[in-house]
């Protein structure tokens, strides 16, 4: 999972790209990068770390131009500690393309082999984003023959070729030297992408493309709409906007985990308020709690900060149980789930959260979290609650059991790492994490909570909950190979302490 942004303006874009990446920081903490286009010259800077730590005044001054893209990285493919695989990526032909991608290709190895053997294109990293960039470059070379002029229609033909050749999830922003900004979304709409406008004094428009609508508010742009599944949009350097459907059979299947955890609560994705979705999840979860736990035994409902707070508040209100804040979050620690490496996650939990004994002593507590993926965090949190004096500790998850690998860009690709990876029951999970009981959202409840807010979205990617992979290419053999590759020891990158 990553965050991407693209901007076409009448003014220099470097500062606004930086501001947009700050608003998308929750989508990736591993690395950040910005690329701009000034005439026919690309400028870029990228490095490991948070946005505020990567960019300095001297870097920003070099990022000249009125058109640019940005990226925050959460590693799912390639080495988590390699600056070489930070984005944007670049190829010099055709024209020169700078590229940023959010998602994960499921046929990257096959496509990579084809690029080498047929198209004679070399891939220098293990990142599937570089593979996708080279497919786009190859298709654009075919769409614009020697002697022909570039056009938005040629760019759309190239995107059609991309859709035919690659599978998986992808939301892309790309700069084409001397031409403009191209953005497109995979035919299933798994990863989010939207755009907005701002009218200048002379009546011209600036365009902003982003993973989440929150950037539109922060940069004072008017949200226009989501990029449709399979659609591509092109904004020329002069601000001319074009769009086209580039997929043969597009379907909308947004990732349910965006609403559960990843996206900011003040974003709206495919017409669904993320905050509203989390409130609805709390209502549906309340029904499950009432069915599995004697409500008279619960003294208070308590969220695990921050993403579970709306669900916990709504659950407490519906069940008429007092709501309390028992954990204080250290806001200088990153999001635990998206930290690379299990060791790092375990180490960070107690640094991230501190329990207040006054809210726990002698009470039966219902802890509400957005999800229980590996169980790493929750096991330690339950222990902290008991150490702080709780008599009983119940746990409720606003997401269903995570039982299957995710192959579309979320860092939980093997069953061996999942606490429910072999179909473990709620009772077995409770024993494992040391809780008195565990209650899960149902898959039906999750889907209903989301469709309640936008009935036009009829399908979601819930593959990590129900094992249904919307791209149709995921087999047992694929998952077995993925798990085997994941379990192989990796050589530490230069500068690694572990």
Predicted regions and their residues:
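Conserved short alpha-helical segments that host acidic/polar catalytic motifs at enzyme active sites
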Residues: 1-229, 234-300, 304, 392
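Flexible loop/turn segments at secondary-structure boundaries
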Residues: 12-14, 76-77, 107, 181, ...
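A generic structural motif
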Residues: 31-35, 325-330, 393-399
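A conserved beta-strand->alpha-helix junction
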Residues: 55, 130-135, 323-334, 432-450
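Amphipathic alpha-helical
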Residues: 135-153, 305, 313-335
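PRPP-dependent phosphoribosyltransferase catalytic core
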Residues: 163, 178-180, 185, 205, ...
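Extended, hydrophobic alpha-helical segments in both membrane/secreted and soluble proteins
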Residues: 301-304, 308-315, 319, 323, ...
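Short, glycine/charge-rich flexible loops or terminal/linker lids adjacent to PRPP-binding catalytic cores
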Residues: 320-365, 376-379, 403-413
């Amino acid at each position: 999972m990553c965050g991407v942004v693209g901007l076409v303006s009448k003014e220099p874009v470097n500062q606004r790209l930086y501001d947009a990446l700050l608003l998308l920081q929750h989508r990736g903490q591993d690395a950040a990068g910005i690329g701009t286009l000034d005439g026919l010259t690309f400028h870029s800077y990228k490095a490991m770390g948070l946005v505020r730590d990567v960019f300095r005044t001297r870097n920003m001054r070099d990022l000249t131009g009125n058109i640019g893209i940005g990226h925050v990285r959460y590693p799912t493919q390639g080495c988590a500690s390699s600056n070489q695989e930070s984005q944007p990526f670049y190829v010099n032909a055709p024209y020169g393309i700078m590229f940023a991608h959010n998602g994960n290709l499921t046929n990257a190895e096959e496509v990579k082999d084809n690029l080498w053997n047929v198209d004679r294109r070399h891939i220098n990293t293990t990142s599937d984003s570089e593979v996708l960039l080279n497919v786009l470059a190859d298709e654009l070379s075919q769409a614009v023959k020697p002697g022909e002029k570039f056009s938005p229609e040629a760019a759309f033909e190239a995107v059609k070729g991309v859709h035919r050749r690659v599978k998986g999830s992808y939301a892309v922003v790309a700069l084409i030297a001397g031409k403009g900004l191209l953005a497109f979304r995979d035919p299933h709409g798994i990863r989010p992408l939207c755009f907005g406008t701002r009218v200048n004094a002379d009546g011209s428009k600036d365009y902003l493309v982003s993973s989440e609508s929150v950037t539109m508010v922060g940069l004072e742009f008017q949200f226009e709409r989501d990029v449709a599944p399979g659609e591509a949009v092109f904004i020329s350097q002069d601000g001319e906007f074009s769009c086209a459907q580039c997929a043969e059979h597009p379907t909308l299947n947004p990732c349910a985990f965006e609403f559960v955890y990843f996206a900011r609560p003040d974003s709206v994705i495919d017409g669904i308020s993320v905050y509203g979705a989390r409130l609805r999840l709390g209502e549906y979860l309340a029904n499950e709690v009432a069915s599995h736990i004697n409500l008279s035994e619960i003294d208070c409902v308590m969220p695990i900060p921050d993403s579970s707070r709306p669900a916990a508040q709504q659950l407490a209100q519906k069940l008429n149980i007092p709501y309390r804040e028992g954990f204080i979050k250290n806001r200088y620690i990153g999001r635990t789930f998206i930290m690379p490496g299990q060791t790092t996650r375990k180490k960070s939990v107690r640094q991230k959260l501190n329990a207040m004994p006054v809210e726990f002593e002698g009470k039966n507590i219902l802890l509400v979290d957005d999800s229980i993926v590996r169980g790493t965090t929750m096991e330690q949190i339950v222990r902290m609650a008991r150490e702080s004096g709780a008599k009983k500790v119940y746990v409720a998850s606003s997401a269903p059991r995570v039982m299957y690998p995710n192959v579309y860009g979320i860092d939980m690709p093997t069953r061996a790492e999942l606490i429910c990876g072999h179909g473990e029951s709620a009772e077995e999970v409770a024993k494992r994490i040391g809780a008195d009981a565990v209650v899960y959202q149902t898959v039906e409840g999750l889907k209903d909570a989301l469709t309640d807010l936008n009935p036009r979205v009829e399908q979601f990617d819930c593959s990590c909950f129900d094992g249904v992979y919307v791209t149709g290419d995921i087999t047992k053999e694929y998952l077995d190979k993925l798990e085997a590759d994941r379990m192989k020891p990796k050589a530490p990158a230069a500068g690694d302490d572990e």
